[in-house]
Amino acid sequence: MRFKLDGRIIFSKDVEEETQKDIVEVLENRDIFLKGVPEGKENEASKIETYEFDGKDLKLKMTSGTYTRAHEGIVRLKKPIMEKVGRKHQIGIRDVAIDKYIVTLTAEPSKVSELKGLKVPECEVELESEKINIVFENLGDGELKRNIIDRAIKFVKNELDKQDQDLTFEVCKIAPGTIVSDYKAKREITFDTDPTELAEPYGWVKRFPGRGQWFYTAPMAKLFRAFESIIIEECIDKIGFDECLFPKLIPLDVMYKMRYLEGLPEGMYYVCPPKREPEMFQDFVNEMMIKKEIPIEKLKTLLRDPAYVLAPAQCEPFYTFFDHELVDVDHPSKFFDKSGWTYRWEGGGAKGLDRVNEFLRGECVWMGTPEFVEKVRDDTLKYAEKLAEKLDLEYWTEVGDDPFYLEGRKSEARGIEFPDVPKYEMRLWLPHVKEERKGVAVTSANIHGTHFVEGFGIKDYKERKVWTGCTGYGLTRWVIGFLAQYGYNYDDWPELIQKKVGKLPEIPKVITWP
């Protein structure tokens, strides 16, 4: 994609020459646009092609690829400009205006032609042979905060790729991304720093050598356990789930039955058991001792083929428990597990404390009639929303576009019954993200219909319909969402959290850290 923007930053008064000089220093610092851009992709980030001062306006022509897109770039300029000139020249920024914005997507001519007559709210769509131009005009801060640009791009992409879409878009009766409920915090949220940036200097976490992993020290662990206790009391116990201890080392055959290997095979950690040949491992040890490095190639020869994965969904053992069993939907099952880590391989997507490869959550899984399964799903979501409101945490709930059991899958030929909405996702607002209104997903409430029932040969003894559902309360993300809105000052926290946490423990005493 390419982005071309004509816009203005509108100041509170005419920009005088001395002020202009300071602003130009900011404009010429391209590092502003390179934060978060992968190495080698710098040309994809926002670039200021021209600028001009005109009274109160700073007129900008900007272009970009897919990293720090132009509409994000113009917003990103506000903070460093104000830091440079606000107090020094007694000037403020009144608004950001985008006069014209062209987003260009490319596709095969045959696919482009299928979009003829497509209407997209708040923009125009212009088609060329291999190009789709999405044209916006007269956008202000309000439209940017409503995220209409990203929604329009997503809408066009969905239309463009309909024949290649994940099964989710075929199944779901409400458009994924639709917000079904939200809550605005009653207090003024003044904390606006990325909690990851403070967690390390404060000594609450320390980076672990593995990608997407952290060592959580005593204060963070205390907060984790407080949230775990509150979620169990305020959500899980109120619905009557029974705690079980689920295995976390999952045989590949289980993942095959779940169809997980079809949808997201690249998102798991695969486990290779070692061969039980001590003399061969002695060679490995000897070589390591002599070379003072790990002989990876030799180690590969000592491992069997992949046989397991580390649990990527946490609910896998539930379906295995009922594999080819006869059940009675008059006596439905409701289990929950909080016994250990869940593992997802995010690759380059792992960042900060909110998107990690190793995380904690309370996983609820249930089975019964379709009506029972839908009611339990609704209850798990309802109590999560009530908890957020009790803690005055700003959130919204939307229709999910990636239910884990459908993610990446294109078709289903087994005659599976699916719910009208496979997934709802509840997000806590992240105030430190300025370019768009972004939230961290803290609760994922899913209904699977007969997907797993068919895959594991589960039947009701009277041949009645059996459905399953699962809700994950992401403990790691609840904590990060909470810290993003409240910060690290204990005195600013809600009374419920303070009582659960008690006295915060001290960080480890280390001379060279944090």
From Swiss-Prot:
Signal peptide per UniProt: none
Gene: serS
GO MF, one example: zinc ion binding
NCBIfam families with a match to the protein in the record: PRK00960.1, serS_MJ
One Pfam match: tRNA_bind_4
Organism domain of life: Archaea
Protein name, per record: Type-2 serine--tRNA ligase
GO biological process: selenocysteine biosynthetic process; seryl-tRNA aminoacylation
Enzyme Commission designation: 6.1.1.11
Family annotation (InterPro entries): aa-tRNA-synt_IIb (IPR002314), aa-tRNA-synth_II/BPL/LPL (IPR045864), Ser-tRNA-ligase_2_arc (IPR004503), SerS_tRNA-bd (IPR041293)
Co-factor note (free text): Binds 1 Zn(2+) ion per subunit. This ion is coordinated with 2 cysteines, 1 glutamate and a water molecule that dissociates from the zinc ion to allow the coordination of the amino group of the serine substrate, which is essential for catalysis.
Annotated keywords: Aminoacyl-tRNA synthetase, ATP-binding, Cytoplasm, Ligase, Metal-binding, Nucleotide-binding, Protein biosynthesis, Zinc
CDD domains per record: Gly_His_Pro_Ser_Thr_tRS_core
Lineage: Archaea, Methanobacteriati, Methanobacteriota, Methanomada group, Methanococci
Subunit structure: Homodimer.
Sequence positions that bind Zn(2+): C315, E363, C470
Record GO cellular component, one term: cytoplasm
EC supergroup of this enzyme: ligase
Residues that hold L-serine according to the record: A313, R344, R361, G362, E363
UniProt binding sites for ATP: R344, W345, E346, R355, V356, R477
Source species of the chain: Methanococcus maripaludis (strain C5 / ATCC BAA-1333)
Entry similarity comment: Belongs to the class-II aminoacyl-tRNA synthetase family. Type-2 seryl-tRNA synthetase subfamily.
Catalytic activity: tRNA(Ser) + L-serine + ATP = L-seryl-tRNA(Ser) + AMP + diphosphate + H(+); tRNA(Sec) + L-serine + ATP = L-seryl-tRNA(Sec) + AMP + diphosphate + H(+)
